[in-house]
Amino acid sequence: MYSELYLRLEPLGLERVAAAVRAAGHDVRLLDLQIFTHDDYRRELAEFKPEAVGFSLNYLANVPEVIDLAKETRRRAPDCFIMVGGHSGSFIAPELLEHGAGAIDCVVRGEGEVITPRVLEARRDAKLSTLPGVVTQDGQGPAPTLLDDLDRFLPARDLAHKRHKYFIGVLDPCASAELTRGCPWDCSFCSAWTFYGRSYRKSSPEQAAADLASIREPNVFLVDDVAFIHPEHGFAIGQELERRRVRKQYYLETRCDVLIKNKELFAYWKKLGLYYMFLGLEALDEEALKLHRKRITPGENFEALEIAREIGLTVAVNIIADCDWDERRFELVREWAMTVPEIVHLTVATPYPGTEIWFTEARRLTSRDYRLFDVAHAVLPTRMPLDKFYAELVKTQDILNRKHLGWSAIPKYGFPAVRALLRGQTNYVKMLSKFASVVNEHRQYDDHQRPVTYEMKPPRPAVAKPDPAELFIHMPARLQKQA
């Protein structure tokens, strides 16, 4: 739902995997189904006649689409090798194979740059199921391995067509780039740390700056899970950008405590073009912050907002709406949000496979429809009747939308909209007109009534502490040593 409205990001991870596959000597094509249609895919399949097709499954809500496309690909190209990878796919590999009913040859868990060329080399070999991170109907290999050097396999951006379609908010058009990978924190609702094993790796300042310099777009989303944890790294990249005279507008995401600790660095990047920042507040009260294991206080969150205002950054924040909220809780969030200048988003608490709360949440799922696992739908029991919950959720989002996108916001956001239009970019302007049709309480409620073809396996009974072997994709180094 959010990708229908607020953003459409280039498939950076897939571009990096494509670069690795191309470096291994293969002819590669990339088709982004955020932009292209299923008919476009069918034409590409018929014209290119690939020996292998890989689907990147980063979002759980796309599982039914990927399964159906894999089955159709098998019918149209019986000899084609079909694999699935990506963030969400890594956590549900066995059930993807089960849903695929023979259409999927393997699921690749973990990072794809190193292992995908090896999979293609071994695709008709009995050794396929022995490769790290590979899961087949015949078995699975050892745990996946991490990419040892982020400077390898820079994105094959030339393979992504219609790049003018990529944007985030007022940054239209917008490319994506990666300076670091991973997150050392352990928030209970997040799967970044469980995927990467709490590792944190950095690209070299020289290569990071060279990559940014190669980007044609005027705007760049820095996709790091937590930007600028290590200030010396951020300063070094900035100095390289200055030396190369690279000037862009940047969007990034970070934590409030990182902003407080490294405020001089963020002020420096403001001079380099940092325009837009996302801060995951997640909650306004200490009890909820502890529940989410944010390891931060409300006071620190509010201090970070003050710092961002002083620097002069446009800031978006997120609040997690728990399914147990009542009308008064929504009202309190609306009241607070109208007193601050920041853009405030609400997402619905969702226990995804791969998050710790998938294992620890005692409330039973009310739906196992993959399409509803998008942080816009309630998949846990709601305190209010479900239709009333959506009414309050959409009412809150509508009020906040008018705050940031209504007439009062024209002085701040009107110029970016005009500038985008003068470039022939219409993504942001179209976003302004689509809110009511996308964020709609009746649509969200009706989504629960759709027939379900593919259901995820239910979680096991809740436990206090998950087994690390089940929780992590890439096992943390300290746990590997203990094994």
Name the predicted role of every residue range.
Residues 4, 92, 185, 232, ...:
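Flexible glycine/acidic-rich beta-alpha junction loops that bind and position SAM and/or redox cofactors
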Residues 95-114, 268-277, 333-347:
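Structural recognition of alpha->loop->beta junctions
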